[in-house]
Amino acid sequence: MPPDAAADSPSALMRVLVLDDDHLLLEVMREMLAACGPCEIALELDARQALARLDEAMPDVLICDLVLPEMDGIEFLQAAASLGYAGKVILLSALEDEVREAAADLARALGLRVVGSFRKPLAPEQLRDALEC
């Protein structure tokens, strides 16, 4: 079966990777994603660990904070693009709208499929709309 065939299968679970350095936000995101329906959820506090996960298996959706220690969200997105990530990207940050939109534009210029750029805290409706669930 081709690698993308499982993702196209109606019975396949949506795979989501959430990268944020806030433990509480990761748990809130887990609950919000679970409320969207069955999915495989991976949570990462560290961008390098998240890149290792991407290198092992590409998720369908990547939810990424922009402000991270050691490697910021932009650097992470550049690395994800260089790995060939082709799934949806949702950006999260407490930064100003202009900064988030500039990051989204940069991610799109890298070939990433940004489906949302939201200010923290993310509302459940925003997540559902971005994921179409």
Residues of each region from the PLM?
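Hydrophobic/aromatic residues positioned on beta-strands within the core alpha/beta folds
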Residues: 91-94
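Acidic catalytic/metal-coordinating carboxylates
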Residues: 46, 72-78
